[in-house]
């Protein structure tokens, strides 16, 4: 098993980041995301907003991986999210549904307010494991997956930044959040 970890500080307040999460796709940095479908949404007894979504992605995979997975390039990911307004956290749990009998990818992302700044802390961990049928190639597959995950995570953060910027500019029309001067 390999683990990918990442931390980032979004220069926007938690309320804006958590609201923007629902508008994250599509964006120009995540063109591999084809569709995001909401399967379930409800407020739990403890007041937490629970949402389950199906994310459809088109992966550009190397030929040697395509041979291992029978040539399928579209994959499905299950995302469950928990928005806890009292604790001021947004937690996302994602797992791949496609190829999960060969390669398991479980990701946890948490957004929470920075304790001192008007910003939001992003923490990400992905556990990637090639399963028994792939043991001979597991290290190679896991490392390739971690490297690819890191690249997509970086583009994902860039894409989310652009979504936040667009929302910020449309909400505050003449000046970005936190700016003291108006823009033309």
Swiss-Prot record:
Subcellular compartments: Cytoplasm; Mitochondrion inner membrane; Mitochondrion intermembrane space
Keyword Disulfide bond: no
Signal peptide coordinates: none
GO biological process: mitochondrial membrane organization; phospholipid translocation; phospholipid transport
Keyword terms of this UniProt record: Cytoplasm, Membrane, Mitochondrion, Mitochondrion inner membrane
Membrane topology field: Peripheral membrane protein
InterPro entries found in the cross-reference section: PRELI/MSF1_dom, Slowmo/Ups
Primary location recorded for the protein, binned into one broad class: cytoplasm
Gene Ontology MF terms in the entry: phosphatidic acid transfer activity
Protein's recorded name: UPS-like protein C36.10
Organism: Schizosaccharomyces pombe (strain 972 / ATCC 24843) (Fission yeast)
Taxonomic lineage of the native organism: Eukaryota, Fungi, Dikarya, Ascomycota, Taphrinomycotina
